[in-house]
Amino acid sequence: MNELVGLNKLEKFEDLDVESSVLHKSDSNDLEHHASLFKGIELESIQLSPGAFEGSVVFAAVDRISIHVSESVQAIEQCMKVDQDKFLFCICLCDTCKETVFGVQGAGSWVYVLPPGGEAIAPTPTHCPVLLMTVQRDALLDSENLVPDVANWFKTLKKDGEFVSSLRLANRIQDDALMTLQSAKAILAANETKTAQIIHQAMISSIAAGFSLEWLEREGFAVIHRTPALDRFLKARHLLADRDLYQGGDGDDELSKLGSKRSVEQAFSEHVKMGPRSYARIVRLHNARRKLREERFFNESIGNIAAQEGLRHRSRITANYSKHYGALQSATRRTAKRRN
């Protein structure tokens, strides 16, 4: 993936030798395959910027911790759902990024924490590396290094989590993750279960200590509150996903309830670099693409699938699809039809 750029903190992870039975790297030109590599998280990704997808993930599982360092050439939006027994920690590894990442600014200086069963919409701009790490719930909450107030904070997190504003904490977790990945390469190639448990315990203890020290110094966490623009974007995004509402002609009326037309457009521009209409077209195009790739739809025509998603002009769907993703998958579908 020659076009991917190693920026700032990402460079440390790119230096890892990943030829290991435990530590892996995958360069992918398939968005769905890229999303499937994340453990402890259910991801559905939407490609926001055009071009054949290029992404990279370095990942490892050490006992009950899973670490992923991800980057893609394209801007993407990830719909994240955390497993019921995991906490998810997210850090942007590009501390010079001026754009919003996961809906907030100040990239590189915060830790986004999602609770077990948590959900989030996470837009990331082009060439934006992120660290996603899942930790087993009980292992973290039972840590001796977690002070009671912090344990209670973790237990009472809302479903959409919190952004903890702390460059020191972000750097500490990033360094812990790097150390764990290095240990996974150096020690765990022989699948030594006991060693994995030791590394896991050290990682849990360090995470717990980092959050506890941050809390004790500040007498609480400095959190980044979601802006009205982010709230407006998320609500408008939900409305645009309602195909029946939009095809019925009520979409603009519903969007107008969220604020002025300009404020809604600014909210979309800030978070996904496009207006609501363009975003809606990309979501419908994404849904059509997903159906085109599913075997149960192979006997349906491309025109019918496009119409189901509100893309009613075959010539337009072909042109838009080719511009955004590359050539339509006609050959794949013809092969599948013959097989069936």
Predicted regions located by residue number:
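Short, basic-rich loop-to-helix N-cap that marks the start of a DNA-contacting helix
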Residues: 278
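Alpha-helical bundle regulatory/interaction domains
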Residues: 2-48, 96-244, 250-261, 274-275, ...
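Active/binding-pocket-proximal capping segment
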Residues: 259-264, 270-271, 281-287, 335-336
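Short, conserved beta-strand element in jelly-roll/cupin
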Residues: 82-97, 133
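Conserved short histidine dyad/triad with adjacent acidic residue
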Residues: 21-24, 50-82
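Short hydrophobic/aromatic patch on the recognition helix
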Residues: 264, 268, 316-317, 321
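Short, conserved glycine- and acidic-residue-centered signature motifs
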Residues: 82, 229, 281
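Short histidine-centered beta-strand/loop micro-motifs
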Residues: 71, 77-84, 101-103, 122-124
